[in-house]
Structure formats: structure tokens, C-alpha cells
A protein has these predicted regions:
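Helix-biased detector of long, well-ordered alpha-helical tracts
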Residues: 1-153
Length: 153
């Protein structure tokens, strides 16, 4: 049973499809991209990979010690997540904790490898960019800076 403010047939800002189709649109698989990356790079270059699904942005802090994972160049939040936030009135700190907000896959690599990983992704028509960095810290934490504020976890 659906009880949100937006009807499933309502149009969604900046999208040619209605809310129902937006919610039901398929998720892209990253398997071909990851396969190509792993055929070229090993654990010396790839320090970690996180699929942002279940635990979303905060999941990464399970895998670091004495590090601040700083995400300050995220992709724009897609209309679906804006719609969820507007209808639920969930604060953005919780949105980034619960939903990926359009940010789906993270690969932790040295800066000199990053551009090649981006080019591999783009060869599969998948947008990619450097979204942040990891810095030494006295504790483990995640800092997200977005158009909706700065959030620490």
C-alpha cells in the first residue's frame, strides 16, 4: 500500500517519466566495469570497493581505522531521492545514511589510478568521478559535504 503525497502517475521534475516508472526503473549492473578494472589492477592499487546498497554512504567506515573518509564532490542527487525526501520530510543527514542518493559504487584507489578507472567506467557509458578522499584521523569517521549541508558520521 502506498500512502505518499505523490501519485504514481504524477510527473517528476526533470524526468520524462512518471513517479511510478521512476521508482520501478532497473538498477544498472556494474559487473562488466568491475571485471575490466580487476583485470587491470590488483590489491596493490585497489584499496577497497563499496557497493552503496544497504548501509549506503556510512558503510565505508566499517572498513577503516584512524581515517576520515571525506566525500565532498558527490554526483547531483537524482529526482527520485529528492521526491522521497520531500514526501517523507527526512533530514538530509539521514537520507545519506539510508539511501545512496544516486551514488552507487565506490572504488578506493591512489590518485594516479583514479583517472584510468574513470575512463574504464565511461567506456561502459557509466559516469564516474573522484568524489572525495581519505585522510588520516584520530578516529574513524565519514564526512559528507553536499548541496544540502555538511554531515559527519
Amino acid at each position: 500500500m502506498y500512502s505518499g503525497q505523490t501519485n504514481l502517475k504524477d510527473s517528476v521534475e526533470y524526468r520524462p517519466i512518471d513517479a511510478g516508472k521512476l521508482v520501478l526503473s532497473p538498477t544498472r549492473t556494474y559487473a562488466p566495469v568491475i571485471k575490466k578494472i580487476l583485470s587491470k589492477y590488483n590489491s596493490n592499487e585497489i584499496h577497497g570497493m563499496v557497493h552503496c546498497w544497504g548501509g549506503e554512504h556510512i558503510k565505508v567506515i566499517q572498513f577503516v581505522d584512524n581515517s576520515d573518509v571525506i566525500k565532498d564532490n558527490l554526483f547531483p542527487v537524482p529526482p527520485l531521492f529528492k521526491l522521497i525526501q520531500e514526501n517523507s520530510k527526512t533530514d538530509w543527514k539521514e537520507m545519506y545514511q539510508v539511501f545512496n542518493c544516486g551514488h552507487r559504487m565506490e572504488i578506493y584507489v591512489p590518485a594516479e589510478v583514479a583517472q584510468d578507472i574513470i575512463e574504464i567506467s565511461k567506456s561502459f557509458n557509466i559516469d564516474a568521478q573522484i568524489v572525495g578522499r581519505v585522510e588520516k584521523s584520530d578516529s574513524k569517521k565519514l564526512t559528507i559535504t553536499s548541496e544540502y549541508g555538511k554531515f559527519e558520521y
